[in-house]
Amino acid sequence: LRFSVNADDLTEGISAEDCLDGTITDRIRLSYQDEISSTPGLYQVTYSAANRAGDVTSLPVTVELYDPAEESGKPQITLSEYLIHLELQQAFEPKDYLEQVNVDQMTYEKGEDDELHAVSAEDKILGEEKLSIENPVDTGKEGVYEVTYTVTSEEGQTSSIRLIVCVNE
């Protein structure tokens, strides 16, 4: 999850549904151990919501605060989803969630072969020298995991984005 350092509300864009109460987005609470400042960086937070029966669910995640003035010209990664739920032992391939990467004045989009092809040069494929994926997901164990996608430009600028993966029974 990424928010501008100028963001007023770190729950904006977050929603919650419950089988008993329906939409409980207005009951989402944010907690954190270390104070969140207006300094760009990564912060560990927990989003939680409760239904009227008192059942509480929590989602611990990393939130990135960024300075919009520093975003110009940096590589960008777009995922098809940013939060997914998997069942125990369900197959998972992190590359399946990559939609688009913009790096070095080139846009790469997912092709029919699931590779990222340059829009302006179909024969050019985004390689591992520019894109790395850190995948700690163990679908054999319940938990909340974060897959980190990082792209690096020829000038050495990097950008990362996270996919939150919840593995449940």
Residue ranges, per PLM feature:
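Low-complexity, Pro/Thr/Ser/Gly/Ala-rich linker/spacer regions in secreted
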Residues: 67-74, 169
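Serine/threonine-rich, repeat-prone extracellular segments and beta-strand-based repeat modules
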Residues: 19-66, 104-168
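Solvent-exposed, low-complexity, repeat-rich "mucin-like" stalks and linkers
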Residues: 1-23, 71-122
